[in-house]
Curated annotation (Swiss-Prot):
Subcellular location field: Cytoplasm
Alphabetized GO MF terms: 4 iron, 4 sulfur cluster binding; metal ion binding; quinolinate synthetase A activity
Signal peptide annotation: none
The protein's name in its UniProt record: Quinolinate synthase
PANTHER family, per database record: QUINOLINATE SYNTHASE, CHLOROPLASTIC (PTHR30573:SF0), QUINOLINATE SYNTHETASE A (PTHR30573)
Function: Catalyzes the condensation of iminoaspartate with dihydroxyacetone phosphate to form quinolinate.
Residues that hold iminosuccinate according to the record: 46, 63, 141-143, 162, 256-258, 273
Pfam annotation, one family: NadA
Cofactor(s) listed: [4Fe-4S] cluster
A GO cellular component annotation in the UniProt record: cytosol
Length: 368
């Protein structure tokens, strides 16, 4: 038998044996590996992850928080990121070259991030430059690919989060007359409106038709919104709010700004994931809340606050499907391959893309 025949190929899809393991055995193995590896292993877990995954997280938070925490951890060799692809990309860009970022399931993407690819964006920028010249600055939500962050970096722009969007949009208007906001039109619209920019000064760029959607004199345009959205938050409607108002008139309604403008306008409060968590945490016992955000997080908030009446704004809401791809079997698989000295599902961003994307990230980080 030759040496080549003895080498076993590294599996790239979840092996069948993980489907037959009991939850108890999987949890036991995860704990064993975590204890064995100690500080060499770091597991960040996004707020939208399942409880079966979050229970093993060394840190929980939103995408940028987790990337920053990972970057500040210089001891860990392996960062097993329990989130979606763009989050792991950001972690890879902010960590050192000798740290390895792993995504337990490479199918864990983000439909919103995928709504703006670099070819579409370069083409749009070229067309918009014909219309507006050098009067625009691009901002991208951190929920975007590394390539889009890099595009913003090399064009003088920056990244934003739902927590600091107002600060970053305000900064953008000190740089240029117009703003191009990618890839979530709703966060861009809600933020700009909150800063006093009228809706009739906002246009939408449709990447599928390569056209600007706007009725009126284009010289009046201040904000150009990319036609993208979050598939989860898009499902909250004004009708949901009307139903809550009718059946529970004393219930507070709080939503994420990835919801559409009409939903945000009709709600009592709107803010980032952290804002929602903090608001419920500080609310008095006995208060009532309908929350418009991802279902795994809503369920976790309900469990953490039994003294409050909390429901999802949309009773038929499902968890984020791509976030849900990261589960206990995939987490254990990733950890066991590391234990064997193998590396699967490694996230590695091109160096030039990293340099330009980090420009955009740093322009944000130095201002917030």
């Amino acid at each position: 038998m030759s040496i080549l025949e003895k080498v076993q190929p590294i599996e790239t899809m979840l092996p069948e044996r993980y489907y037959t393991m009991s939850t108890e055995n999987m949890e036991k193995r995860v704990r064993e590996i975590k204890e064995k590896m100690g500080g060499k292993l770091f597991i960040p877990g996004h707020h939208y992850q399942k409880d079966e995954v979050v229970q093993f997280s060394d840190a929980a938070g939103d995408s940028l928080q987790l990337a920053q925490v990972a970057a500040s951890n210089k001891e860990a060799k392996y960062i097993v990121f329990c989130g979606v692809h763009f989050m792991a990309e950001t972690a890879d860009m902010l960590t050192t070259d000798d740290q390895i970022v792993i995504l337990p399931d490479m199918r864990a993407g983000c439909s919103m991030a995928d709504m703006a690819d670099i070819e579409q964006t370069e083409r749009a920028w070229k067309e918009l430059m014909k219309l507006f010249g050098d009067t625009m600055i691009p901002l991208t939500y951190v929920n975007s690919t590394a390539a889009i962050k890099a595009f913003c970096g090399r064009n003088g722009g920056a990244t934003v989060t739902s927590s600091n969007a107002k600060q970053m949009v305000s900064w953008a208007f000190t740089q240029k007359e117009r703003l191009v906001f990618l890839p979530d039109q709703h966060l861009g619209r809600n933020t700009a409106y909150d800063l006093g920019i009228p809706l009739d000064k906002m246009a939408v760029w449709d990447p599928h038709t390569d056209s600007l959607e706007y009725d009126g004199d284009i010289e009046e345009i201040q904000v150009i919104l990319w036609k993208g959205h979050c598939s989860v938050h898009q499902n909250f409607t004004v009708k949901n709010i009307e139903n809550v108002r009718k059946n529970h008139p004393d219930m507070n309604i709080i939503v994420h700004p990835e919801c559409c403008y009409e939903v945000v306008a009709a709600s009592d409060y709107a803010g980032s994931t952290k804002y929602i968590i903090d608001m419920i945490e500080s609310a008095p016992s006995g208060s009532k809340w309908a929350i418009g955000t991802e279902m795994n997080l809503v369920n976790r908030i309900i469990q953490q606050h039994p003294d409050k009446e909390i429901v999802s704004l949309n009773p038929f809401m499902c968890p984020c499907l791509t976030m849900n791809r990261i589960d206990l079997p995939h987490l254990l698989w990733a950890l066991e391959t590391i234990e064997r000295g193998e590396e699967i599902n490694v996230i590695s961003v091109d160096k030039q893309v990293t340099e330009e994307a980090v420009l955009a990230l740093n322009r944000m980080l130095e201002r917030v």
